[in-house]
Amino acid sequence: VWVGVIPNETLLGLSKFNRLVQWIGARPQIQEETVEQIADEIPVAFIENYDMHTGLMMTSGVDVWLNNPIRPMEASGTSGMKAAMNGVPNCSILDGWWPEACIHGVNGWAIGNAEDDRDDDRDAENIYKVLENDVLPLWEEDGDGWSNMMKASIAASA
C-alpha cells in the first residue's frame, strides 16, 4: 500500500512517484485500468487524497505499521505515533520518533541501525529479515506475545 501526499505537487515528488509507478509496471498516469492490469502480478494499492480521516482509519485499523523512510528525511513520524497509541506495533527504519521509542522485539521492531547511512538495498534486505524472522512468527504463533507487543506499543506512545 502506497500512501502519501506529494508535497505541493513538486516536480521532484511527481518524478519520484512516476518512477515508482513505472517500476511496478504501470504507466505514469494512475488509472483504474492500469491498476487492474498489474493486480495479478503485483498487489499494489495507492490511496489518493490522503487526509486526516484516512490517516485515522489506517493508524487504528492495521496490524503492523511498516514505515520505511529515507534517513534522515522522516520529520517526526506522527502516523507511527498514532498507530502505537492504537496498539499497533511499529516496524520501522530508525528515523523520526522511532529511535527514541523502539525497544526491538518489545514494542515493535527496528529495521537496520540508526547510524547507518542511506543504503536502499540493505534497508530492503533488513525489512524482509525483520518481517520473516520477527514479525510473522510472533503474529502467526504467539497470540499472547502479540497482545503484549500491542500493550507495549501503547505504553511507548504515552
Predicted features along the sequence, with ranges:
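Polar helix-capping/helix-linker motif
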Residues: R27, V35, E141-D142, A158
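Nucleotide-activated donor-binding/catalytic signature segment of Leloir-type glycosyltransferases, i.e.
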Residues: W2-T54
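Residue-level preference for alpha-helix termini and adjacent loops
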Residues: V5, N49, W97, S157-A158
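Short, charged N-terminal helix-start/capping segments
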Residues: V1-W2, N90
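Catalytic binding pocket for nucleotide-activated donors in carbohydrate/polymer assembly enzymes
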Residues: M57-S157
